[in-house]
């Protein structure tokens, strides 16, 4: 029955599909918000009213894209679908908890939308810093609703993380060790550990903010012996691991795609890749204050956070060069998925280089809160995470649906998206270097040219999003079924047919090592 299957589901494939659909829908909302931002900034002068409504849109854009698009698709969608298939498990360890993880997200999303509908909205930025987020600057329920929304999304992610850790450690076939699991499984494991360790700190921080706003506590109010900088430390102790949570599953997917379309049986430097991911996960927890170089920390503290941040470039470099080595000498098949992977490797590296620039505390004091930072993190997210999602989608779409996408449309789609995002975000480096600050709805005329170019790019990206919807419709309408899949010996997820049956591995898998 429909309700039993989709509302009360305990099947990892169905829940994965729900996550993918929810993430795609939220992605449309987030894209719409970003188009509003770029429309406002397309020329000097006001389009939408005041800065409050602008900042509400910016805040909602960030939350929607992070918590309701990237995380549900990468961890919930691809994670749920692929992890059990890749390790030969019949399902996730806690199938009902898996369902709850998903169904906490729509209410969370509704709370976030409600926060923008009542009062003046939460125009705090996604960081929700007090005193701007306090009850003086933001009276009314908007920020409280945003906090509750984050609580629900956080609980959802923590439950999901527990589920993935248990599944990956306990549900492998007896003969399979952790070092024989595919890299995507490793990436989800590291991501889950990061979620489990970082989200409780965010929960603590926003709960304190909630009591500051409603119960007269003074955790972040100097008048009562509190300190708003404490909130920043708590938030960024979560916030920095969070950005690695957003990109690590992408690393795993890119490893699979690069290997598959190079005609290789395994990625180059498997153990190096695993240790690089674990190193990135560990280092991600000890660099948080690089987001706070301008709050007046000691020079020795700044020196430490500068060097620690730069160290992350080493394992990241290991991954980039291992991907290139995987491609090297392979029998390259120029599929759309490989194009996304190549685009990812190039653009993620560019974003990483601007990250190295920002790691220097002396330079960051000048560049902090300018469009240089916006350009940096959109290169690693809008062209890192999103390119990985798109690559994973066009690669595994035949597995999920049983149908194939039109390869020509898929390549055209990649091209449009590639041009669009680069045209949107590359000029923002110039704006940042010439001092244009973030989070303002208007700007001096001197910045007009690059803002106009950037806004044009965003509309090209919008075209790509619409084309993707068409591509998916076309695939389901044409019903080109999958005939054969290559390289199944080292890609277990394809072994059960396309799409796999409702229950796979009903008896324990026999794995010969």
Swiss-Prot record:
Compartments, as annotated in UniProt: Mitochondrion inner membrane
Enzyme class: translocase
Topological domain ranges for the Mitochondrial intermembrane compartment: 41-50, 118-140, 213-227, 287-298, 358-370, 434-446
Sequence positions that bind Na(+): 40, 45, 441
EC number: 7.1.1.9
Binding site for heme a3: 376
Reaction(s) catalysed (UniProt annotation): 4 Fe(II)-[cytochrome c] + O2 + 8 H(+)(in) = 4 Fe(III)-[cytochrome c] + 2 H2O + 4 H(+)(out)
Residue numbers binding Cu cation: 240, 290-291
Record PROSITE patterns: COX1, COX1_CUB
Main location: mitochondrion
Pfam families noted in UniProt: COX1
Entry-linked CDD domains: Cyt_c_Oxidase_I
Mitochondrial matrix side: 1-11, 87-94, 171-182, 262-269, 328-335, 401-406, 479-513
Keyword field: Calcium, Copper, Electron transport, Heme, Iron, Magnesium, Membrane, Metal-binding, Mitochondrion, Mitochondrion inner membrane, Respiratory chain, Sodium, Translocase, Transmembrane, Transmembrane helix, Transport
Covalent cross-link 1'-histidyl-3'-tyrosine (His-Tyr), where: 240-244
Membrane topology: Multi-pass membrane protein
Membrane-spanning intervals of the chain: 12-40, 51-86, 95-117, 141-170, 183-212, 228-261, 270-286, 299-327, 336-357, 371-400, 407-433, 447-478
Residues that coordinate or bind O2: 244
Functional summary from the UniProt entry: Component of the cytochrome c oxidase, the last enzyme in the mitochondrial electron transport chain which drives oxidative phosphorylation. The respiratory chain contains 3 multisubunit complexes succinate dehydrogenase (complex II, CII), ubiquinol-cytochrome c oxidoreductase (cytochrome b-c1 complex, complex III, CIII) and cytochrome c oxidase (complex IV, CIV), that cooperate to transfer electrons derived from NADH and succinate to molecular oxygen, creating an electrochemical gradient over the inner membrane that drives transmembrane transport and the ATP synthase.
Oligomeric form and interacting partners: Component of the cytochrome c oxidase (complex IV, CIV), a multisubunit enzyme composed of 14 subunits. The complex is composed of a catalytic core of 3 subunits MT-CO1, MT-CO2 and MT-CO3, encoded in the mitochondrial DNA, and 11 supernumerary subunits COX4I, COX5A, COX5B, COX6A, COX6B, COX6C, COX7A, COX7B, COX7C, COX8 and NDUFA4, which are encoded in the nuclear genome.
Recorded family membership: Belongs to the heme-copper respiratory oxidase family.
UniProt name for this protein: Cytochrome c oxidase subunit 1
Lineage: Eukaryota, Metazoa, Chordata, Craniata, Vertebrata
């Amino acid at each position: 029955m429909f309700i039993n299957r989709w509302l009360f589901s305990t099947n990892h494939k169905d829940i994965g599909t729900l996550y993918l659909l929810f993430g795609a829908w939220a992605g449309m909302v987030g894209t719409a918000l970003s188009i509003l931002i770029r429309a406002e900034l397309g020329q000097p002068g006001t389009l939408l009213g005041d800065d409050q409504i602008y900042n509400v849109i910016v805040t909602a854009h960030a939350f929607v894209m992070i918590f309701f698009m990237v995380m549900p698709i990468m961890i919930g969608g691809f994670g749920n679908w692929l992890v059990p298939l890749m390790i030969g498990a019949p399902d996730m360890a806690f199938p009902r908890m898996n369902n709850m993880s998903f169904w906490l997200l729509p209410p969370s999303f509704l709370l976030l939308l409600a926060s923008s509908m009542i009062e003046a909205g939460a125009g705090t930025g996604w960081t929700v810093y007090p005193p701007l987020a306090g009850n003086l600057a933001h009276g009314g329920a908007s920020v409280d609703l945003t906090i509750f929304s984050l609580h629900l999304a956080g609980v959802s992610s923590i439950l999901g993380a527990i589920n993935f850790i248990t599944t990956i450690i306990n549900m492998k076939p007896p003969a399979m060790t952790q070092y024989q699991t595919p890299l995507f499984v490793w990436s989800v494991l590291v991501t889950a550990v990061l979620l489990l360790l970082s989200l409780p700190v965010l929960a603590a921080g926003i709960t304190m903010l909630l009591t500051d706003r409603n119960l007269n506590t003074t955790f972040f109010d100097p008048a009562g012996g509190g300190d708003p900088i404490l909130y920043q430390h708590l938030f960024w102790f979560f916030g920095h691991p969070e950005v690695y949570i957003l990109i690590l599953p992408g690393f795993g997917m890119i490893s699979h795609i690069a290997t598959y379309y190079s005609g290789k049986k395994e990625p180059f430097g498997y153990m190096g890749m695993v240790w690089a991911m674990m190193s990135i996960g560990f280092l991600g927890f000890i660099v948080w204050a690089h987001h706070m170089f301008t709050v007046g920390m000691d020079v020795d503290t700044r020196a430490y956070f500068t060097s620690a941040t730069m160290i992350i470039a080493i394992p990241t470099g290991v991954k980039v060069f291992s991907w290139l080595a995987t491609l090297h000498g392979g029998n390259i098949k120029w599929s759309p998925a490989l194009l996304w992977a190549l685009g990812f490797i190039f653009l993620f590296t560019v974003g990483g280089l601007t990250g190295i620039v920002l790691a220097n505390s002396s330079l960051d004091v000048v560049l902090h809160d300018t469009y240089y930072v916006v350009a940096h993190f959109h290169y690693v997210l809008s062209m890192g995470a999103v390119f990985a999602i798109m690559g994973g989608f066009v690669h595994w779409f035949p597995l999920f649906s049983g149908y194939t996408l039109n390869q020509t449309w898929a390549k055209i789609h990649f091209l449009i998206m590639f041009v669009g995002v680069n045209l949107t975000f590359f000029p923002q480096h110039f704006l940042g270097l010439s001092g244009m600050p973030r989070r303002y709805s208007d700007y001096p005329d001197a910045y007009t040219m690059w803002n106009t170019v950037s806004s044009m790019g965003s509309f090209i990206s919008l075209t790509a999003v619409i084309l993707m919807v068409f591509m998916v419709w076309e695939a389901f309408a044409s019903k080109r079924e999958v005939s054969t899949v290559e390289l199944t010996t080292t890609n277990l997820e394809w072994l059960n047919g396309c799409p796999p049956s409702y229950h796979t591995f009903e008896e324990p898998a026999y794995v010969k090592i």
